[in-house]
């Protein structure tokens, strides 16, 4: 059998499309909020399809999982950079959010790989119960991730407009009220990610040191 080209698997092609849409979004962010947000959300929406394609076509790969996570982290980080420019008084909060997001996911992924998991989304039964629900319940994972991204996207749009009025309240403002608790919960889960991964790494270090004695 000819060797398979992992880079041309359908889920990975979707991943490349996500990167292209994200870059287009970043290009338009300084001047064209609705164009930028449309491409940003389209990039995020495709995130739901690459996983389905991987399962349906049996094309799940470590490269694809890494590509997916890095695209998510980089896209969110670039949006937060723009938010820091638009809301300079909240710059520290955006910096902390970026740092927490990147650090928690990287350490969690690294600890999963060291422990032998094929993906950072594979949680064993002895793992943290909150993370177990987060990664084994697709509705919970989708709601938290989509709500978090939508919150930041609405915050970006809100700088330019309140949005269409719904009664006496702008749609973007209303959306921020709804998604803000979701974004806050996502940050709490990121803290749990970080603490759990740090404990896992410390336990692995302790086990390695015990073997050497």
UniProtKB/Swiss-Prot annotation:
Q: Which GO terms describe its biological process?
A: CDP-diacylglycerol metabolic process; phosphatidylinositol biosynthetic process
**Is Magnesium among this UniProt entry's keywords?**
yes
Positions on the Lumenal side per record topology: 27, 95, 161-174
The lineage, from the top, is: Eukaryota, Metazoa, Chordata, Craniata, Vertebrata
TM segment ranges = 6-26, 28-48, 74-94, 96-116, 140-160, 175-195
Stretches assigned to the Cytoplasmic side: 1-5, 49-73, 117-139, 196-213
Protein name, entry field: CDP-diacylglycerol--inositol 3-phosphatidyltransferase
Superkingdom of origin: Eukaryota
Q: Where in the cell is it found?
A: Endoplasmic reticulum membrane; Cell membrane
Q: Which gene encodes it?
A: Cdipt
Name the keywords, alphabetized: Cell membrane, Endoplasmic reticulum, Lipid biosynthesis, Lipid metabolism, Magnesium, Manganese, Membrane, Metal-binding, Phospholipid biosynthesis, Phospholipid metabolism, Transferase, Transmembrane, Transmembrane helix
Extract one GO molecular function annotation from the record: manganese ion binding
| Pfam families (UniProt xref) | CDP-OH_P_transf (PF01066)
Assigned EC number: 2.7.8.11
Which reactions are catalysed by this chain? a CDP-1,2-diacyl-sn-glycerol + myo-inositol = a 1,2-diacyl-sn-glycero-3-phospho-(1D-myo-inositol) + CMP + H(+)
**Membrane topology note:** Multi-pass membrane protein
Active-site residues per Swiss-Prot or TrEMBL entry: 72
Q: Tell me, in a sentence or two, what this protein's role is.
A: Catalyzes the biosynthesis of phosphatidylinositol (PtdIns) as well as PtdIns:inositol exchange reaction. May thus act to reduce an excessive cellular PtdIns content. The exchange activity is due to the reverse reaction of PtdIns synthase and is dependent on CMP, which is tightly bound to the enzyme.
Naturally occurring in which organism (per UniProt) = Mus musculus
Residues that bind a CDP-1,2-diacyl-sn-glycerol: 51, 55, 61
Q: Which residues form the signal peptide?
A: none
